[in-house]
């Protein structure tokens, strides 16, 4: 949640991002061009979808072994793999972090990678995805990301 200066509480990542945009955050998290902005939002939702599928896996793995559905686990891992492949292709185009300017898709992707690493639901996700690894390394060097990294267990 975000507590604004006026004590208003904002929650949900997309609402917080929109609040920051409305406040004129610099650099802007979304491009001024509507189509470019829509492309960034689509990548944001792709990263969010990966987190949703990862959460399904986490919850399924919490069930007793004999009640776990292998089909649910496989289906969601496949969703994650396909989505990661799409993000890898976009990251390989080199369009993210141009001139160090962070955007909403970068933030969502960094959060998603952090969640995958924390929960370990997709082992070796990074083996065939060097552009995403490079993006993650760049993001996690930022103070804003480093401050939100969960402590080591």
Regions found by a protein language model. Give the residues of each.
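Carbohydrate-binding/catalytic loop surfaces
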Residues: 153
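Non-transmembrane alpha-helical segments in soluble domains
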Residues: 17, 21, 41-44, 84, ...
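GST-like domain detector, emphasizing the conserved glutathione-binding G-site
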Residues: 1-70
């Amino acid at each position: 949640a975000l507590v604004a200066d006026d004590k208003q509480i904002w929650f949900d990542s997309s609402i917080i991002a929109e609040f920051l945009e409305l406040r004129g955050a610099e650099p802007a998290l979304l491009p001024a061009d509507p189509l470019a902005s829509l492309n960034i939002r689509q990548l944001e939702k792709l990263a969010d979808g990966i987190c949703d599928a990862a959460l399904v896996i986490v919850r399924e793995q919490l069930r007793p072994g004999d009640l776990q559905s292998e089909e649910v686990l496989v289906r969601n891992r496949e969703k994650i793999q396909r989505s990661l492949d799409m993000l890898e292709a976009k990251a390989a185009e080199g369009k993210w972090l141009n001139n160090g300017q962070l955007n909403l898709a970068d933030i969502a992707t960094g959060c998603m990678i952090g969640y995958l690493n924390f929960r370990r639901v997709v082992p070796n996700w990074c083996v065939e995805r060097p552009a995403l690894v490079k993006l993650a390394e760049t993001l996690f060097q930022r103070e804003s990301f480093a401050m939100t990294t969960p402590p080591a267990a």
